[in-house]
């Protein structure tokens, strides 16, 4: 990854790291901070959890929890090393571009799968919206509500979902093309 592509990938990964942290009961800003420190030290061979602790002031248990989470998702990898002054083994954490590219590709495929399911669902169902507050309801929900908005009492109107579906299909097509490009770049022989 070079230039703008790298910056975009790092930003995408940071968003992913924040969401991953939040879903696992970890402070998102702490996980993002650790991720950025590892990213900055990757060209130098990585950074140890002891160094992360001294740089951030975070508790070692929190740091290790974040490292384990990022490692499990193959965002970072570790290598074993020796402490320069002690005889203890240390682990140095770094971002491995090969595994991270595969992780991003896997994530894109999961997003694509969800979008395809949404497109199939949306194309087979009609929706109703409230012209006053903008609330959206499926046909079944609108039927149950007697086609009256429960928030403001306005009569629900059938929504024209063609434009939204077309936008969703363009997004799906673009993501499929991006996945194909990524696969050819990652798996080229």
UniProtKB/Swiss-Prot annotation:
Keywords for this entry? DNA-binding, Transcription, Transcription regulation
Give the highest taxon in the source lineage.
Answer: Archaea
Entry annotated with the keyword Transcription regulation: yes
| One function term, GO molecular function aspect | DNA binding
Domain HTH TFE/IIEalpha-type, by residue range, is: 9-101
Question: What's a BP term from Gene Ontology annotated to this protein?
Answer: regulation of DNA-templated transcription
The entry describes its oligomerization and partners as: Monomer. Interaction with RNA polymerase subunits RpoF and RpoE is necessary for Tfe stimulatory transcription activity. Able to interact with Tbp and RNA polymerase in the absence of DNA promoter. Interacts both with the preinitiation and elongation complexes.
Q: Which family does it belong to?
A: Belongs to the TFE family.
State the function annotated in the UniProt record.
Transcription factor that plays a role in the activation of archaeal genes transcribed by RNA polymerase. Facilitates transcription initiation by enhancing TATA-box recognition by TATA-box-binding protein (Tbp), and transcription factor B (Tfb) and RNA polymerase recruitment. Not absolutely required for transcription in vitro, but particularly important in cases where Tbp or Tfb function is not optimal. It dynamically alters the nucleic acid-binding properties of RNA polymerases by stabilizing the initiation complex and destabilizing elongation complexes.
Give the comment on domains. Answer: The winged helix domain is involved in binding to DNA in the preinitiation complex.
Name of protein: Transcription factor E
Organism for this UniProt entry? Aeropyrum pernix (strain ATCC 700893 / DSM 11879 / JCM 9820 / NBRC 100138 / K1)
């Amino acid at each position: 990854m070079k230039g703008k592509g790298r910056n975009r990938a790092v930003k995408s990964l940071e968003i992913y790291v924040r969401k991953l942290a939040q879903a696992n009961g970890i402070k998102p800003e702490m996980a993002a901070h650790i991720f950025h420190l590892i990213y900055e030290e990757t060209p130098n061979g990585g950074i140890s959890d002891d160094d992360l602790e001294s740089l951030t002031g975070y508790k070692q248990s929190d740091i290790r929890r974040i490292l384990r989470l990022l490692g499990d998702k193959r965002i970072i990898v570790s290598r074993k090393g020796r402490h320069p002054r002690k005889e203890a083994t240390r682990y140095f954490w770094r971002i491995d571009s090969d595994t991270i590219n595969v992780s991003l590709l896997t994530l894109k495929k999961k997003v694509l799968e969800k979008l395809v399911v949404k497109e199939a669902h949306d194309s087979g169902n009609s929706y109703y919206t409230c012209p006053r507050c903008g609330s959206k309801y499926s046909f079944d929900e609108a039927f149950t509500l007697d086609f009256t908005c429960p928030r403001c009492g306005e009569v629900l109107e059938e929504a024209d979902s063609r434009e939204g579906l077309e936008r969703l299909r363009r997004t799906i097509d673009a993501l499929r093309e991006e996945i194909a490009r990524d696969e050819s770049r990652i798996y080229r022989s």
